[in-house]
Amino acid sequence: MASCVLLHTGQKMPLIGLGTWKSNPGQVKAAIKYALSVGYRHIDCAAVYGNEIEIGEALKENVGPGKAVPREELFVTSKLWNTKHHPEDVEAALRKTLADLQLEYLDLYLMHWPYAFERGDNPFPKNDDGTIRYDSTHYKETWKALEALVAKGLVKALGLSNFNSRQIDDILSVASVRPAVLQVECHPYLAQNELIAHCQARGLEVTAYSPLGSSDRAWRHPDEPVLLEEPVVLALAEKHGRSPAQILLRWQVQRKVVCIPKSITPSRILQNIQVFDFTFSPEEMKQLDALNKHWRYIVPMITVDGKSVPRDAGHPLYPFNDPY
């Protein structure tokens, strides 16, 4: 069993979870079943990933009374998509996720991004020129609607994803249910030290997405640095008899940062949770800390006039224009 962090709600959140972004239907069900069989007790989902129905099939077969895993031992996260920020749309969006996942409640529900897209069922509403159609709903209004889900017992904890420090404080200024978790891209090239400190001072735990550098994403640039080929990481892997991925994950869990590596390959799913039986010295941690160069891999891109441009960078609530 992976060790945990304790949320301010009293919930235990396992430090390693299975990520499901880019896990295709047809593959994700077997991946979840295998992950549960080798001790994973944390699954990270999102409505926009388009695979919650199949994840739900895996959960129905393996979780609950008389099944391999009791429901109360499993920590399931999902995320509210940008088209569902309007307060009138929030509960219905959650209920669809619960129905798809075949669950009665979520352990954690995150606002996926701070800004809202145009309301409706097309997840990426676009103008004729390829740019996104936005909605003016502010995340503080969305947060109030999310709080009602906790009161109804549909969600145990709320959190944020891709919010910067200023936006987190903005939520805290209006929250009666305080966010418990911030989920952001985080790895040695983007260590997020300031943001993590900011969260810890305010009672939020941090989850790292793309903790291995997300080399399989669509808008990858051919000459960008490859985290899994970083010499410092390879040297530590050789020294400890571990894989490069295990080195990257151990660094995070030793910092008490939750990780959600995505894999559909059984050998890698198993490897990714085997990071609790070795430890880095302070010097080894410093070697990995020194790799930080504020390199962000995950910036959603769109094609406008034949050019690839950041999808949302012009939006006033875009989170990544701030230092952290």
From Swiss-Prot:
Q: Which residues carry this modification: N6-acetyllysine?
A: 126
Q: Which UniProt keywords apply?
A: Acetylation, Cell membrane, Cytoplasm, Lipid metabolism, Membrane, NADP, Oxidoreductase, Phosphoprotein
Q: Where is the active site?
A: 49 (proton donor)
Give residues where N6-succinyllysine occurs. 126, 144
Residues where Phosphoserine is found: 3, 37, 210
Supply one GO BP term: daunorubicin metabolic process
Q: List the disulfide bonds.
A: none
Q: What is its main location?
A: cytoplasm
Any idea of its EC number?
Answer: 1.1.1.2, 1.1.1.372, 1.1.1.54, 1.1.1.19
Asked whether the UniProt record includes Cell membrane among its keywords, one would answer yes
Enzyme type, top EC level: oxidoreductase
Its recorded reaction(s) are:
a primary alcohol + NADP(+) = an aldehyde + NADPH + H(+); L-gulonate + NADP(+) = aldehydo-D-glucuronate + NADPH + H(+); L-gulono-1,4-lactone + NADP(+) = D-glucurono-3,6-lactone + NADPH + H(+); allyl alcohol + NADP(+) = acrolein + NADPH + H(+)
List the residue(s) that the UniProt entry marks as the site Lowers pKa of active site Tyr. Answer: 79
Renumbered to this chain, the signal peptide range is: none
Q: Does the keyword Membrane apply?
A: yes
Q: Which family does it belong to?
A: Belongs to the aldo/keto reductase family.
The record's PANTHER family line, in alphabetical order, gives:
ALDO/KETO REDUCTASE
What is this protein's function per UniProt? Catalyzes the NADPH-dependent reduction of a wide variety of carbonyl-containing compounds to their corresponding alcohols. Displays enzymatic activity towards endogenous metabolites such as aromatic and aliphatic aldehydes, ketones, monosaccharides and bile acids, with a preference for negatively charged substrates, such as glucuronate and succinic semialdehyde. Plays an important role by catalyzing the reduction of D-glucuronic acid and D-glucurono-gamma-lactone. Functions as a detoxifiying enzyme by reducing a range of toxic aldehydes.
Protein name listed in UniProt: Aldo-keto reductase family 1 member A1
Q: Which organism is it from?
A: Cricetulus griseus (Chinese hamster)
Starting at the broadest rank, the lineage of the source organism is:
Eukaryota, Metazoa, Chordata, Craniata, Vertebrata
